[in-house]
Amino acid sequence: MEKYKIAFFTDLHIGVHQNNERWLDVTYKWAKWFTSELKEKNINKIIFGGDLFHYRDEINVKTLHFTDKLLDLFDEFELYMIPGNHDAYYKDNATVHSLSILNNRKNIKVFDKPTAFNLASKQIGFCPWGTSIDDVPTDCDMVVGHFELENFNFNNHKICEEGMKSQDILKKSKLIFTGHFHKRQQRKFEDGTIIYAGNPFEMDFNDIKDQKGYYVLDFEEENITYDFYENNVSPIHVKVTLSELEDLQAIAKNKGWSNLSIKIIIDKEIKINLLDKIISSINYEGPFALTTDYLNKLTLGDNISIPNDLGDLNIKECIVE
């Protein structure tokens, strides 16, 4: 085994989308891929940056049962975990958290208080959700947290306007790895580097075109190094306008229909019956999910025959100009 290499991932959100079975399946398939990747790299240590579960107030029994099965995939690994805000009962601290149910697993260590811990020759500061800047351990080679840092992106559309300041957290360590924000971000400052690892796979349309995956950290040298490995196995989200729907073919050819969660933006006037048949044609291809968003009006249409195969469909002929 690689003594000095440690994997990092965060924000798994088990039970996302109302404990939907299909999303549990996405999570399980990702975990099988992830653990297989680490075994190939001879890595048996993993740090997790918070938000194992999605719902903080209660956890579905089916989701609990699934989590037990999921964690069996990690039996050969050492897991070092912190609770995130979705794991915490209280909104501002992690004194009561759902990761306590993992205490019976000997390969898992949960840090629910700010703690400096020696791991593979490095001093790591573990900071659960709600850790104040004053309580972040000092003189650490790296700090792991679930921080809300000012001027970083929550996602592709929203920036955090209030939170901890980067210059304050970098006084504690020159390297910060954190969960919480789902957009993967890596910023270098004069005093060090802050990395939001992001969620391991896309979970909604806010994640569009954001690289997902995991990091591998190397603790062997004095300065910690790290590499990012992209997840190419999980479904992605795609927004496409009706007028550019033909672009969907190329995306599907590359990724596969079953790995596409699609939102069609109705940006042109179209006859209702034609839109219904277009949607049926796409559903025939078997996408992971399909929704529509209406920016334009619909009109009553003629009874025009449209084939099931999307490849034979002329979208432009269906649009009312």
Spell out what each predicted region is.
Residues 6-8, 47, 126, 142-146, ...:
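Structural motif
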Residues 11, 50-51, 84-85, 146, ...:
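Active-site glycine-centered loops adjacent to acidic/histidine catalytic or metal-binding residues
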Residues 3-5, 12, 16-116, 169-173:
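Core catalytic region of metal-dependent phosphoesterases/phosphodiesterases
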Residues 156-222:
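Conserved beta-sheet core of the metallophosphoesterase superfamily
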Residues 1-7, 116-126, 138-142, 190-194, ...:
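Beta-strand-turn-beta hairpins that frame and shape the catalytic cleft
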Residues 2, 40, 219-321:
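Accessory, non-catalytic peripheral segments of nucleic-acid enzymes
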Residues 12-14, 144-148, 174-184:
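Histidine-centered catalytic micro-motifs
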Residues 67, 87-168, 197-200:
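Conserved catalytic scaffold of divalent metal-dependent phosphoesterases
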